[in-house]
């Protein structure tokens, strides 16, 4: 393994999720083990300090715009995500590790392209990437309930 590309994070909740077991444990497992989601793009990101200085209401507005793009791709079945928080957990001091998973590669790239036009990405990110994209080489069988 190359230490420069070793990334580590933890699942997290935003506070409005009705089922924390699903949000924090079961949904990420379902997504990474779903054989229909054969294409992936993984990348780290670090927010700029400018975002942290915004009022909470402004942060929410910016994140709703950004999240709306992801929800549109997700509700159409094109992109599903796994989001990991990695504040203080890895060498490069990133804030998040994002995994985009889908049945085809093009929508994953299209989603990243579209999100770059949001205020969150275009103004309030210090660092984005490197990107790791490809077809899943192997998946374990999903756990049985």
What are these regions (language model features)?
Residues 40-46, 85, 90-115:
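Short, well-ordered beta-strand segments in beta-rich or mixed alpha/beta enzyme
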Residues 1-72, 103-106, 138-145:
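Short S/T/G/P-rich N-terminal loop/turn motif that feeds into the first structured element of a domain
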Residues 1-18, 76-80, 103-132:
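An amphipathic, aromatic/His-enriched active-site/gating alpha helix that lines ligand/cofactor pockets
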Residues 26-27, 74-85:
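Short amphipathic beta-strand starts and helix->beta connectors
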Residues 50-55, 95, 110-112, 118, ...:
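Generic marker of "main functional regions" within proteins
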Residues 95, 101, 131-141:
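Short terminal or interdomain "cap/linker" segment that borders an active site or interface and mediates
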Residues 64, 87, 119, 129-136:
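Short, surface-exposed, charged/polar-biased interaction segments
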């Amino acid at each position: 393994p190359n230490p420069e590309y070793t990334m580590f994070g933890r699942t997290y909740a935003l506070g409005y999720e009705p089922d924390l077991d699903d949000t924090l444990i079961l949904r990420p497992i379902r997504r990474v083990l779903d054989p229909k989601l054969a294409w992936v793009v993984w990348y780290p990101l670090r927010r700029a300090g400018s975002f942290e200085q915004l009022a909470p209401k402004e942060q929410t507005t910016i994140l709703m715009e950004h999240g709306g793009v992801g929800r549109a791709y997700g509700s159409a079945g094109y992109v599903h995500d796994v989001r990991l928080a990695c504040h203080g957990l890895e060498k490069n001091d990133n804030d998040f590790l994002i995994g985009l998973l889908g049945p085809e590669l093009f929508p994953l790239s299209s989603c990243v392209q579209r999100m770059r036009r949001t205020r969150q990405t275009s103004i309030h990110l210090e660092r984005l990437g490197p990107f790791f994209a490809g077809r899943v080489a192997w998946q374990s069988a999903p756990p049985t309930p």
